[in-house]
């Protein structure tokens, strides 16, 4: 995926092992370098393969350091699902 820098646009696609055809809510959640957790709108782009996308804008990638991302999905039957973590280092410009 190459380097991603603080304050840039970035598209993240995450894939889970769950069929998202009966999803009520999808998010990409993130543990940021300062240990806060944020939630971002997730767009389901492949229901059968469980792929969710978020296009980060420059204000969302507001910290350099190690981030951990995962899918959160709430299904129409009320069950909640948390996907496998994906780790990504976000760099300061010039690094």
Question: PLM features: what roles do these ranges have?
Answer:
Residues 1-95:
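Contiguous segments within soluble domain cores/interaction surfaces
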């Amino acid at each position: 995926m190459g380097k991603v820098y603080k304050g840039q646009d970035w598209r993240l696609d995450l894939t889970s092992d769950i069929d998202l055809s009966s999803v009520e809510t999808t998010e990409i959640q993130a543990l940021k370098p300062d240990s806060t957790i944020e939630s971002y709108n997730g767009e389901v782009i492949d229901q059968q393969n469980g792929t969710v996308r978020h296009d980060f804008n420059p204000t969302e990638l507001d910290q350099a350091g190690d981030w951990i991302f995962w899918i959160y999905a709430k299904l129409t039957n009320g069950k909640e699902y948390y996907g496998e973590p994906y780790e990504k280092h976000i760099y300061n410009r010039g690094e």
